[in-house]
Curated annotation (Swiss-Prot):
Protein name: Uncharacterized protein YkoP
Designated gene of the protein: ykoP
Lineage: Bacteria, Bacillati, Bacillota, Bacilli, Bacillales
One Pfam family recorded for the sequence: YkoP
Organism: Bacillus subtilis (strain 168)
Domain of life of the source: Bacteria
Amino acid sequence: MKTCFLSIWRVVDPIYFFFSRLSLIDNDQKSVFRVRLTKYKGHHVVLSDGTHIRKNDVLVKIHLHNIKLIRELQSIESAVRKGIIIYQKVYQSMPLLLDYINNHKKSEKIKGIIGITMLDKGVERLGFDVITPVNPFYRCFKKVSHVPILYLTSKPVSLRHLPNSSYLFISKEKLQKTYQKKD
């Protein structure tokens, strides 16, 4: 069943990629991120470095390239090992994300990065702040939308015990301080 679902997802993913206006951040496709610019529509947030994120601030929305990750992790049984590999791939992609932002034509307007995920363990070490979405309908929608990913990547999880989704934020300044290449 999972193999069938994965095959369908492989067909649907390029269509989703096109209609969601996502972009790859590197030509070599080494990154696990696909991104797009977005105007923030949530509540006012103050990040750990003091950056204020307000309604209509321009952010880079990051999406993990799930189908790519699932393919790479398919043969790995250990959830801990999968988590370590995802962490390493995200860490290796962060400098590429910084390059993407620095070279973007709207770089001056970009205030930071936003993502939404159920994979929020250890992301603080990557520089992210974890914020729980305030809107209960949005939280429920994101929880349901993450079910296919959970189905493909983990042991069976009951709908009652689905993990909560969290916003991940990092300011552009913190991203630069943390991931700027040292010459």
